[in-house]
From Swiss-Prot:
Record GO terms (molecular function): GTP binding; GTPase activity
Domain of life: Eukaryota
Placement of sequence motif Gly-Pro-Asn (GPN)-loop: 76-78
Record: residues binding GTP: 19-24, 178-181
Family: Belongs to the GPN-loop GTPase family.
Subunit and partners: Heterodimers with GPN1 or GPN3. Binds to RNA polymerase II (RNAPII).
Protein name: GPN-loop GTPase 2
Keyword DNA repair: no
């Protein structure tokens, strides 16, 4: 995006598995950013997305349609989507022609949910790399459904996927635990919330897995996976409830810090006006303890806490 000022644009690449809330996040974040005074352009990069709830500035479906690809090449949904992303990678001139008139906007890229696109397939990473050449500074926002915290085996799997995504995508990166307002619906947590957000000593998870006859046979494998995660020590999570302005603001602060966005004085005044009712003059990150008290009922003690009382 070289040429007339402003030469640098900022945005978010919203990624994550199907059902993690990417499209809902784009809707909620776009509304929040507009309330701050930012000009927002939401770009749909998922050719399988239909009936989008937000106003779409650019839609990859105008370039290539998943249904057409599946019919013409006799591919399944996953193979068809990979082909669509490779087709977009080969036709980036089309994407640049769509983005250039939106210079000066803050971009939200709603990306496909196929995990392999973010862990080992090269098309999406190549697209992001080319955007960097256009002076578009993105932060990868990786959404994970918070219900995985209630199952130790699934949480280890999520940690592995998050780590692989961080290493593969090659963008400034934050991980979100989405749908925090629904976490109680999935069962009790084995530990306090900060154990999962900060990814503390994972050996305790192994002890919980050892109580399951099925996973007891895979203890050595789980130990190696946990060791890999702890050796890199890169993964952590920010809790998110997209309906909560305070929660969205914590995420936005992390995103702006990651990609270097510096907001204007006018935006700061808009932020203070918006958040004063809920947060007063305190714009620092809330403690994880406060977040736990907000989203978990006082009677919902962790499994670990109940065991200690016996």
């Amino acid at each position: 995006m070289a040429g007339a000022a402003p030469t640098t644009a900022f945005g978010q690449a919203v990624i994550g598995p199907p059902g993690s809330g990417k499209t809902t996040y784009c809707l909620g974040m776009s509304e929040f950013l507009r309330a701050l005074g930012r000009r927002v352009a939401v770009v749909n990069l998922d050719p399988a997305n239909e009936g989008l709830p937000y106003e779409c500035a650019v839609d990859v479906g105008e370039l290539v349609g998943l249904g057409d690809v599946m019919d013409a090449l006799r591919l399944g949904p996953n193979g068809g989507l990979l082909y669509c992303m490779e087709y977009l990678e080969a036709n980036l001139d089309w994407l640049r022609a769509k983005l250039d008139p939106l210079r000066g906007h803050y971009f939200l890229f709603d990306c496909p949910g196929q995990v392999e696109l973010c862990t080992h397939h090269g098309a999406l990473r190549s697209i992001f790399s080319q955007m960097a050449q256009w002076d578009l500074r993105l932060t990868a926002v990786h959404l994970v459904d918070s219900h995985y915290c209630t199952d130790p085996a699934k949480f280890i799997s999520v940690l592995c996927t998050s780590l692989a995504t961080m290493l593969h995508v090659e963008l400034p990166h934050i991980n979100l635990l989405s749908k925090m307002d629904l976490i109680e619906h999935y069962g009790k947590l084995a530990f306090n919330l900060d154990y999962y957000t900060e990814v503390l000593d994972l050996s305790y998870l192994l002890d919980h897995l050892a109580s399951d006859p099925f996973f007891r046979h895979y203890r050595q494998l789980n130990e190696k996976l946990v060791q890999l995660i702890e050796d890199y020590s890169l993964v952590s999570f920010i809790p998110l409830n997209i309906q909560d302005k305070e929660s969205i603001q914590r995420v936005l602060q992390a995103v702006d810090k990651a990609n270097g966005y510096c907001f204007r004085a006018q935006e700061q005044r808009s932020l203070e006006a918006m958040m004063s009712a809920a947060m007063g003059a305190d714009f620092h990150f809330s403690s994880t303890l406060g977040i736990q008290e907000k989203y978990l009922a006082p009677s919902n003690q962790s499994v670990e806490q109940e065991a200690m009382q016996l």
